[in-house]
Amino acid sequence: MEFGLSWVFLVAILKGVQCEVQLVESGGGLVQPGGSLKLSCAASGFTFSGSAMHWVRQASGKGLEWVGRIRSKANSYATAYAASVKGRFTISRDDSKNTAYLQMNSLKTEDTAVYYCTR
């Protein structure tokens, strides 16, 4: 009985930690090669304005690939991009909405992937 209560307590703690930070992506869809798409990442549970935000992606059957990042206002909102997307993708952010964006233009078939934001 004592073990069971401890286990339930541990699960409750882990669930609480898991829910502390939330990053919710939206805006995905199907587009033709050459098209455009804008993804959004709504953040909560941490100080968004002071955090760098990154985008990564994972194509089917492949590992994670870093796409790019945007730093905080204190770091002049500096951006950096993977060579594969530079000049086509643009990362921006709206600190008042706790949201980061990934504008993807001139899309290629090789851009097909699941996209994630992270901090």
Swiss-Prot record:
Residues 20-119 form the Ig-like domain. GO terms for cellular component: extracellular region; immunoglobulin complex; plasma membrane. Residues 70-79 are annotated as: Complementarity-determining-2. It is found in: Secreted; Cell membrane. Residues 80-117 are annotated as: Framework-3. Residues 45-52 are annotated as: Complementarity-determining-1. Residues 53-69 are annotated as: Framework-2. Transmembrane segments: none annotated. Disulfide bonds join C41-C117. It comes from the Eukaryota. InterPro entries: Ig-like_dom, Ig-like_dom_sf, Ig-like_fold, Ig_V-set, IgHV. Keywords: Adaptive immunity, Cell membrane, Disulfide bond, Immunity, Immunoglobulin, Immunoglobulin domain, Membrane, Secreted, Signal. SMART domains: IGv. It holds the Pfam family V-set. GO terms for molecular function: antigen binding. One of its GO terms (biological process) is immunoglobulin mediated immune response. Residues 20-44 are annotated as: Framework-1. PROSITE patterns: IG_LIKE (PS50835). The keyword Glycoprotein does not apply. The keyword Cell membrane applies. Residues 118-119 are annotated as: Complementarity-determining-3. Residues 1-19 form the signal peptide. Immunoglobulins are composed of two identical heavy chains and two identical light chains; disulfide-linked. V region of the variable domain of immunoglobulin heavy chains that participates in the antigen recognition. Immunoglobulins, also known as antibodies, are membrane-bound or secreted glycoproteins produced by B lymphocytes. In the recognition phase of humoral immunity, the membrane-bound immunoglobulins serve as receptors which, upon binding of a specific antigen, trigger the clonal expansion and differentiation of B lymphocytes into immunoglobulins-secreting plasma cells. This is Immunoglobulin heavy variable 3-73. It comes from Homo sapiens (Human).
